[in-house]
């Protein structure tokens, strides 16, 4: 979701939302931080290219260990900026306590949800929110996405549950989302809205989102023809040293 409130934003000459006095420092990002921002921008545009998002849908964040006076922070995409017009300087750095540390634009409206997931799971290093078609079909039906493809069970690590619909812009929603996902599965569906995927890297979180969308399509098509075989993560015997596809 990418809506913004007129009560808290103004619009820049480029047509982008700008915080009123709430922006953090505009210090030039470090080389490592800039590389993280470039990776986020790449996967934002890739999400549109492969059909996971459209227009300004979705958002991405990455954990920055120790970036806030020794505590973790995150860098997150801004609110309501098209990915083809976004630059690395548009992204916002926020402490896990919600303090904006760097950035001239407003962070994604779903920032509180990202923060709750990072707080619950220290293993999570990146979050990808998408609004893809087949995930949303199953989400609108309130139907859990069971793994029927290898990539789904390898990356998501189990069935992906569906939350009942509600607005996803507050910490209470974030806590419920993180609780439903749990500690062993790496995705959750927001009913009538989209998917939130996590990973130990942005590359992995993106692969989770791709795998769940592909699986959702196959699950729908296979269910129309019969009863698909559901895979169980614990039953998959991955050979030692094997690399994930």
Where are the regions that the model predicts?
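Glycine-rich flexible loops
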Residues: 2-245
